């Protein structure tokens, strides 16, 4: 990126020059599309239905005063639907609302949509005729082309301020944020071979980056507000927060549902008045692989799939609401019931994944006797924080089991994202209850917003980098093209550890030239991470990359992989094998090795051991949870049988008090009842003893502490 107001983007994006003396929006670029006239004036379109982008001949036609809809002949390459900006905007025109004027009606600030997006300058206005002309221009394309798939996931990163605990430890803020370019830099302190410290920089670029001074209102306007109108058009929108424990996920997510419900009710009472829409609220959590209703005294729920492979929560109680105060009371009730605990990293850590759903349903033909039909849904998911065993050494065994279950579900979520990113035919959504709930967030007509919460302290540097890499993989998720298999045969690109601003300056190519390109671009326009496949490296590189990703959220307390090199450390044109080192516990200082010994060390990494340990721990955890459920079920059955036998004993006593009773019959029946009770107790004791032995074998038995 050069100075003087000149910015260069890929050929799918709008590229224009703004004079240095241009006031107001100098240097800004239109995300929805734009036309540059000969005199340098820029018209930016923010029409929410189809973000068209005019280039080449359209710009000349617009400068001449000719409407794009009047062009009868459309030459190839005029409109690249795969290069649309992927900001989460609804796919329909709201009746009575044009150019997002409705955002001013129910916004929380005095400004409109332009104020909430830093890429739109306040003085950049546009005429409605330009928008309507672009809409007519798109009508000339076939429906199949207009429905071309684009990325539907927006990734926002929020940085929290240093807390008192970090300040008392004199930890430093290692994250620098540039909101103008939506980028951030992590300054990681490392040690050289001679034990001298040096700082390594990791650069990331996302759809939006928010610093510690941003309020929750601004977070809402940046993330959830643009997708609220879409849920009235059979769209399922999801907003979830991800990050390490104590990074501010619950603080970020707590006010968002209330603000979204205010906007939904306002749209229902104004824009969609008398159309039969109703709003329903439900709130449940996933704790230890089980589902509990937070609005119904934590009653246990079951997750099922219907014939259309849609996830249904059996027994979930929904409340129909019509005002904001009722929603606020329900949210506070659910938050008070949610499972929380104290860990070494956070005093009030969320030990469960909480899911709040705002469902919009519509009456069928205006008939109240029939159940309403689902029109759209907005889900808010507050994920439990990812953590390592080293962070929870001062906690009991139950806390460690909770952490293992949390990490297992987050690992399953990462596997689903990786499968979608690699265009695999099978997506392992059934790996955990969390991924089953999130199935609708990644497939079908969906809109997803991911808020990655990061800690700025130097002590959380490793967690922060893992969170940012996780978010970067979600950001690169795009179903718009299947060119990965073809690109794998092309020349090897420069390996990078993270996306950078430098990568954004590399121009992309048209669909005819993509096959010859050595880099692959997502719909956001940033270079996606790829590793070198050359000579004998492919098998080793693929294997090591998979090991690193599989063990990033490992259930073990010790080993993990950590990248030793970052982008920019290799000259252009030189292939490099990913340099990963298996480590146990804390990271030791790495001594210098020559290339031969380094390769031998890599080949000797215990890859089968890692692949063998993690499934065993998963299997043991699943077996313990299943045995716990069996024990509780057996106990419940024993209590029910005991109640039935008590009723029978009471009837037997009544008969014994009657004159002329048969003593032999009384003795026989009483003996049978006592034998049945004794057999049930012995069976339950045997189950309990077996479960205690299993807990002792796995060193997870909890003993009550004496006062």
UniProtKB/Swiss-Prot annotation:
GO terms for cellular component: microtubule. Signal peptide: none annotated. Residues 619-656 form a coiled coil. Residues 152-477 form the Kinesin motor domain. One of its GO terms (biological process) is microtubule depolymerization. It comes from the Eukaryota. Pfam families: Kinesin (PF00225). ATP binds at residues 243-250. SMART domains: KISc (SM00129). SUPFAM superfamilies: P-loop containing nucleoside triphosphate hydrolases. Keywords: ATP-binding, Coiled coil, Microtubule, Motor protein, Nucleotide-binding. Belongs to the TRAFAC class myosin-kinesin ATPase superfamily. Kinesin family. KIN-13 subfamily. This is Kinesin-like protein KIN-13B. The gene is KIN13B.
